[in-house]
Amino acid sequence: MINDIKKDGEDRMKKTLEVLENAFSKVRTGRAHPGMLSGVMVSYYGADTPLNQVASVNVEDSRTLLVQPFERSMVQAVDKAIREADLGLNPMTADVIRVPMPALTEETRRDMQKLARGEAENSRVSIRNVRRDMLNDIKELAKEKEISEDDERRASDDIQKITDKYIASIDSKLEAKEKELMEV
């Protein structure tokens, strides 16, 4: 029972880390990476479709993304979707779409850093909520006399260690992201 609670909690914590990594991939760093365009939706025959389903997105060089629509007729629609995605990007269109990454100003870097810190804090809160749920489940088992007080204390210590591990992971990911943001 205790192991099930810990495993379930740890799975939820892993999902929180995945969400954080996904959020960090969308934070603009001045360097080109395909994840930046993952939230772009293209109007494809009247339906909003994710960009990666109508075009391939590749890194041409460190500051340029190359977007190649699968259908030539989609070039204008993809270009329009990227412009309207509110990412501050200005694609150049020919047969393929080149998306140059504008250099980040100091102010933009600070804003992106604040955004990254906010995402990290949300993840920490989520991890702590999972810890609280796990501890409540353990206390419930102890209250119903299904586990001893020693087992409860041991499980609580284990849960705290798991929580500390994931919080440290969030902190290291944030530190790496901030370092990446401040590189010129």
From Swiss-Prot:
GO BP of this protein: cytoplasmic translational termination
Disulfide pairings: none
Keywords: Cytoplasm, Protein biosynthesis
Gene Ontology CC: one annotated term: cytosol
CDD domains hit by this protein: RRF (cd00520)
GO molecular function ontology, one term from the record: ribosomal large subunit binding
Key word Protein biosynthesis present: yes
Protein family membership: Belongs to the RRF family.
Function according to Swiss-Prot or TrEMBL: Responsible for the release of ribosomes from messenger RNA at the termination of protein biosynthesis. May increase the efficiency of translation by recycling ribosomes from one round of translation to another.
Protein name: Ribosome-recycling factor
Source organism of the structure: Psychrobacter sp. (strain PRwf-1)
